[in-house]
A protein has these predicted regions:
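Nucleotidyl polymerases of mobile genetic elements and RNA viruses
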Residues: 1-167
Length: 167
């Protein structure tokens, strides 16, 4: 069942995610983004451009995904309701307790975090992170480094983001 849901979500990922996001996508890897950054810095030297790169790694990225926000994002991105419901059902009613010394706390609801190791988690995280980037105010036409007639202001691999700008 999860494989079918993953295949459906990946169809929407292909549509929604820009080519600057290489994480969790078939045929792409960290080496691609490292090579892109290397090429960009080399070209900047050739054309004597000052560029600035800011490397960001989300700490505990999968743990920070808010469930309610995720369902809203999936809806906004046009993910069909039935796919969102199936995903939501995986997280419905999750509870946990914590052992503190010799005692155990009472049960509490888990409202954040996507499952580590679940085949759906990379898709869900990519869509969540894409929403953040779309709403970060980084308009491609206004900022970034001009490459082949296009401004590129970020490169991403899963939870690693490189922001780029010229001086």
């Amino acid at each position: 069942m999860l494989k079918i849901l993953q295949a459906r979500l990946q169809q929407y990922m292909k549509r929604e995610l820009p080519d600057v996001q290489a994480g969790f996508r078939k045929g792409r890897g960290t080496r691609d983004q490292i090579a892109n950054i290397g090429w960009i810095t080399k070209e900047a030297r050739v054309f004597q451009k000052n560029i600035y790169l800011c490397f960001i790694d989300y700490a505990r990225a999968f743990h920070c995904v808010d469930h309610n926000k995720l369902w809203k994002i999936l809806k906004e991105m046009g993910i069909p309701y039935h796919l969102t419901c199936l995903s939501r059902n995986l997280y419905a009613g999750l509870e946990a307790t914590v052992r503190t010394g010799h005692a155990i706390t009472g049960c509490f609801q888990i409202a954040k975090g996507i499952h580590q190791g679940c085949i759906l988690s990379p898709c869900l995280f990519n869509l969540y992170a894409e929403y953040i980037m779309r709403n970060a105010g980084l308009e491609e036409t206004q900022a970034g480094i001009k490459i082949a007639g296009r401004n590129i202001n970020n490169l991403r691999y899963a939870d690693d983001t490189t922001l780029m700008a010229e001086s």
